[in-house]
């Protein structure tokens, strides 16, 4: 069901790699809610080609950009405004990558070049997007920027390694830039801390199935799906959340507020 929440709005959606991507679902939802937007991803991700199907479904243009390259982000914001015919109302940052995780490196055996790369791709890229947008004055008054995070920013999860610091940094950038951009142009900046979700980035983490199931049994509402995340993100892009900014918003079925659930207790009692 469409509510027309984003009628007349222009956006930029990053990170749609394939149908499982959270950004893919956000794009479909934003389209359904009446938005027009451009799609972007790292040039290397384009080779897989799936994004073209999404672009067709949404009537969107694809503008490749490596989110760590300021020059490419300048092109992204400039061309998006040209294609869409005006300033941008919403931006989705849905970007994460850690080579240490991909290569199963333990927290006590991290490669520091990869560590810095993970921070650059997964966190600093949000700052680069915001600073580029501000310098180009590319985001409209009252616009909304959302980045996706994970609760490993607050709590330790052994296999999340350097991405835990990336997410802590991402959330901190959202607060600091949220203050600046809010004062300057009423632009909101928030992070949405999402449940474990079966995507390329998600399932790349070793032990993913176990902690997906653990989170599901801990959360009174169960894990939030990518589609449900898209529903939430769309409200944050809409005019219904005009005074929400500088927040890390949990979208996790209640996981972040639970100490232990009856289900986990029962499971451990059975084992004991
Ligand atoms: N899947 C989960 O369990 C989960 C949970 C909480 C938060 N998140 C976050 O959600 C976001 C989206 O991830 P996803 O789970 O949809 O997985 P995904 O693999 O579908 O998306 C990650 C995207 O990042 C893009 N990317 C990587 N390097 C890039 C670069 N240099 N420039 C531009 N784009 C680049 C990839 O091409 C890909 O499209 C990430 O920030 C992720 O950390 C995921």
Per-region residue spans from a language model:
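Canonical Rossmann dinucleotide-binding motif of NAD(H)/NADP(H)-dependent dehydrogenases/reductases
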Residues: 3-39
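Hydrophobic structural elements of the Rossmann-like NAD(P)H-binding subdomain
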Residues: 13, 92, 146, 189-192, ...
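Catalytic loop of short-chain dehydrogenase/reductase
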Residues: 15-25, 96-184, 193-199, 222, ...
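Aromatic pocket-lining residues of Rossmann-like dinucleotide-binding sites
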Residues: 30, 181, 236
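Conserved glycine-rich Rossmann-like NAD(P)H-binding loop of the short-chain dehydrogenase/reductase
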Residues: 35-51
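Conserved mid-core segment of classical short-chain dehydrogenase/reductases
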Residues: 55-57, 63-74, 78-117, 135, ...
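C-terminal helical subdomain
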Residues: 124, 187, 191, 209-244, ...
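Short C-terminal tail/terminal secondary-structure segment
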Residues: 245-272
């Amino acid at each position: 069901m469409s509510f027309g929440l984003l009628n007349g709005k222009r956006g930029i959606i990053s990170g749609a790699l394939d149908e499982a991507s959270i950004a893919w679902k956000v794009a479909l939802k934003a389209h359904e809610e009446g938005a027009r937007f451009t799609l972007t991803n790292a040039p290397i991700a384009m080779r897989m080609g799936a994004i073209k199907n999404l672009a067709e479904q949404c009537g969107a243009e694809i503008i490749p950009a490596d989110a760590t390259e300021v020059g490419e982000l300048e092109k992204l914001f400039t061309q998006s405004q040209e294609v869409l015919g005006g300033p941008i109302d919403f931006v989705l940052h849905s970007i994460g990558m850690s080579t240490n995780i991909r290569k199963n490196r333990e927290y006590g055996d991290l490669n520091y070049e990869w560590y810095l790369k993970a921070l650059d791709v997964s966190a600093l890229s949000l700052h680069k997007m915001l600073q580029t947008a501000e310098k180009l004055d590319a985001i409209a008054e009252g616009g909304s920027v959302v980045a996706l995070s994970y609760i490993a920013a607050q709590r330790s999860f052994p296999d999340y390694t350097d991405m835990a610091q990336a997410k802590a940094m991402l959330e901190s950038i959202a607060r600091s830039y949220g203050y600046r951009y809010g004062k300057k142009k009423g632009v909101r900046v928030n992070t949405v801390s999402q449940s474990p979700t079966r995507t390329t980035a998600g399932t790349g983490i070793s032990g993913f199935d176990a902690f997906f199931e653990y989170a599901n049994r801990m959360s009174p509402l169960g894990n939030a799906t990518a589609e449900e995340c898209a529903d939430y993100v769309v409200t944050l892009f809409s005019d219904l959340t005009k005074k929400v900014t500088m927040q890390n918003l949990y979208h996790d079925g209640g996981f972040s507020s639970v100490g232990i659930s009856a289900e986990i207790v029962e499971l451990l009692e059975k084992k004991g």
